[in-house]
Amino acid sequence: MIVSAIANGGTLMKPYMIDHVENVGGQTVKKFLPSAYGALMSANDAQFLTHLMSQVVEIGTGSAMRGASYTVTGKTGSAEFETGKETHSWFVGFAPADKPKVAICVLAEESGSGGAVAAPIARQVLDRYFAKYGQ
């Protein structure tokens, strides 16, 4: 949700799963609309974080996202959870970077670094999303 707030210029939105409900005849009987919890950060802070996350993709550990037909912001990471075990890897981000449509979070347990494991998984998901829905 934090990444989506960055994508929304600092506004934290309430998550929802259902766009609308239809009756048997296919008529919409209830429509769900996006609504905000409120400002999580200033628009300037969100813009600065977007820039930093874009740099992760352009020159940092988010290299799996480079060369996509869409722009991506992201942050990779790893989390230790038990001595002697492989770390959890993760990637969070949103795309397109300039007019976000989708936020993503990938967590791969006991798999290593975020740049090597989670980011390539996120790339596959985003590639399929944009192939189906366009930019």
Regions found by a protein language model. Give the residues of each.
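Active-site beta-strand/loop architecture of penicillin-binding DD-peptidases
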Residues: M1-A36, N44, M53-Q135
